Each structure stands twice: as structure tokens, then as C-alpha cells.
């Protein structure tokens, strides 16, 4: 069965194991998620559990949103997402960080940091041209393709907006769970800026 929770990225730090091993970790704060709706094949055409995370003021919600969360007897939520393959939850129940434990392998999804308009070297890792005197080719995108089609093919590496994409990093290890602080420590870094939404789910490709 899949396990999942929504949280916010706090930042990075490091911890030491009892053996003295240095481990860089990302701190994720995941306050209790509230189950807002349990979707079934009969009513919705598929099975999923809809959860809400991070309370917001009622004045920022419209009437349909207020009525939706009222069924779960909770406050309006800033983020609403769905998890599949989760069983045994009812509307109004809470999902807390203690569903995970140290050693669990998870997939972490976030929105990568926006870098603005960037060139092909930074955006695609393209090699630069000669920097010596006399060269007129330094950081340009290079050939646009053959003459015959009279157009540029799709997916040609060009300059443009970089970052701000949905990114999933698979098979990250949970180093520690601190239930009293609603905190999960994940080994390594995860996508996104501080305070950004992070989705943590059981790894789909974890070694069994």
C-alpha cells in the first residue's frame, strides 16, 4: 500500500550518526494532512484519496471550497492533492509524519527553482565555442538544422525560461522522523525553494 503526505521545505542541515558519519539532510515540515474526500470507482470513475494541507483564512475561500472542507470538519486548505493506492482512510481523518519511519525509501516531488531567461550553456549544458581572439562563436546556440525543411525542428536546444518545473527525485532515504515537531529528515537535497510544497510518497521503484 502506498503512503503519502504533503509538506513544506524548511531548508537543509546536517546530522551525524552514532558511528560519526556525516549526512546532509533536507528538513520537511509536514503538519497533519486532512482527508477531504475518498474517491471510488462508482462515484468518480477511479480510486483516490484527496488530502488538504496548510490552513488558510476563510475569507480567502469561496463558498464551494468552504462547503467541501466542511464535510471533513476542518478549515480551508491552501494545497489539495490526491494519492492513489491508499486504503483505510475516512473523510476527516488525519495523516501524520509517523506513517513513515527511518530507513523508508520515498519519491519526493516539488517545483524546481525558477532561473529566469537563460542561454543554452546554463539551460542545456551545451559546450561553448572557442574563446580565443578571432572567434566569433562563444555562447551561441549553434546550427538551427538542415536547409531542406526551411524550419527549426521541435526540441531544438535554445535559450528560454529555465526552472519552475515539476520535478520528482526517486529513491531518497528517510533518515529521521520527529513526530512531536511534524518533521521529516530526508537524505540529500530535494527540488524547490524554501517554503515550497513538497509531496512525499512511497517509492515506486524501491528494491524489494
Curated annotation (Swiss-Prot):
PROSITE patterns: RIBOSOMAL_L3. GO terms for biological process: translation. Part of the 50S ribosomal subunit. Forms a cluster with proteins L14 and L19. One of its GO terms (cellular component) is cytosolic large ribosomal subunit. Pfam families: Ribosomal_L3 (PF00297). The gene is rplC. Belongs to the universal ribosomal protein uL3 family. The lineage of its organism: Bacteria, Bacillati, Bacillota, Bacilli, Lactobacillales. InterPro entries: Ribosomal_uL3, Ribosomal_uL3_bac/org-type, Ribosomal_uL3_CS, Transl_B-barrel_sf. This is Large ribosomal subunit protein uL3. It comes from Streptococcus thermophilus (strain ATCC BAA-250 / LMG 18311). One of its GO terms (molecular function) is rRNA binding. One of the primary rRNA binding proteins, it binds directly near the 3'-end of the 23S rRNA, where it nucleates assembly of the 50S subunit. SUPFAM superfamilies: Translation proteins (SSF50447). Residues 123-146 are annotated as: Disordered. NCBIfam families: L3_bact.
